[in-house]
Amino acid sequence: MKVDLHVHSIVSKCSLNPKGLLEKFCIKKNIVPAICDHNKLTKLNFAIPGEEIATNSGEFIGLFLTEEIPANLDLYEALDRVREQGALIYLPHPFDLNRRRSLAKFNVLEEREFLKYVHVVEVFNSRCRSIEPNLKALEYAEKYDFAMAFGSDAHFIWEVGNAYIKFSELNIEKPDDLSPKEFLNLLKIKTDELLKAKSNLLKNPWKTRWHYGKLGSKYNIALYSKVVKNVRRKLNI
């Protein structure tokens, strides 16, 4: 089973992934997505419930959330609210400076207090325009012994599964069947495997990237933003 931990549905204003089509695609491709809409908790029976939460000092994702977290809270208040739910704190594209709310821009990633909250670091985001932000995330996760994960950051249906982790031992009918703690333990096992492959990634990232996922391009990202705005405006969504 493939797990893509960073997927947006049409609930995110920057996405064109209808829920029904998303479900059919994921079932066909044997993908369990984590739906991480911007500042909205979207619960779907085929997906891990998540939310990409904007705060006053960057953004992060809460996985296995039960309640929505409001946008633009103080960073630590938002982190506390996620932790109170027993959910996982996941750092998406933390070093991608092309993102307006990248955590690296707010100089919080090395704060001692912040480090106490983190469970998982996204070490491969397939929408990053270059390999460097992903390599920095990999080094950061290794430095602090955090679990590692991949996410496509899909905004279009054809992007879903561009980055994923394959769990041969994971076979669940509903993502709700899995507890956050159990899933984190599985990720830690996969993290050990990823570190063994790290040398190959560093030696030839442009070749190895196709094994881990597909990198986005600045042209695709520029195009998608225009397409999404035009389509949503015409459909009034």
Curated annotation (Swiss-Prot):
Molecular-function GO terms, alphabetical: 5'-3' DNA exonuclease activity; 5'-3' RNA exonuclease activity
Database matches in InterPro entries: PHP_domain, Pol/His_phosphatase_N, Pol/histidinol_Pase-like
Pfam families: PHP_C
Superkingdom of the source species: Archaea
Protein name: Uncharacterized protein MJ0417
Native source species: Methanocaldococcus jannaschii (strain ATCC 43067 / DSM 2661 / JAL-1 / JCM 10045 / NBRC 100440) (Methanococcus jannaschii)
